[in-house]
Design a protein with these regions (language model features):
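A well-structured
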Residues: 1-138
Length: 138
């Protein structure tokens, strides 16, 4: 089924972007110099935004609409489509700007968390934690 293959190709690109974001995050926590944090926040925000835009592309919704309920799908493919639909529906509820802001905040809060842990002073992280909680509730 061509629509299913098209969807898989789009999802592969989204997954690759997620893997790149994970590598950037890992590097930030393990090896990156502290002074590089603002640039890393920008990089992570960009990759999060681009990934979100691809996932919420109306073409993904069109492909899902075309594929859902197809008699041609195997059981595993049908399960995959249900999961993709759930991800698509959730993602489309979040504005891209919000996703970008979350990525920037998450990256910057790693810096304050690391400093708070090193100094044993968790008040350093309090404001970032508060913002994280507010974003999670939004």
């Amino acid at each position: 089924m061509k629509a299913y293959e098209d969807l898989l190709e789009r999802l592969r690109e989204i997954d690759l972007m997620g893997q790149i974001g994970s590598l950037l995050s890992w590097d930030q926590e393990v090896m990156m110099p502290k002074k590089a944090a603002p640039l890393r926040a920008e990089q992570l925000a960009w990759i999060s935004k681009a990934s979100h835009e691809r996932l919420t592309d109306p073409k993904i919704g069109e492909l899902l609409d075309e594929i859902e309920g197809s008699e041609e799908l195997e059981e595993v493919q049908s399960a995959n489509i249900r999961l993709v639909r759930k991800s698509f529906d959730r993602a489309t509820k979040l504005p891209t700007d919000f996703v970008e802001e979350m990525a920037i905040h998450r990256s910057k809060s790693i810096v304050s968390w690391t400093e708070a842990r090193e100094k044993g002073d968790f008040s350093i992280f309090r404001d970032d934690l508060s913002v994280s909680i507010d974003q999670a509730r939004a």
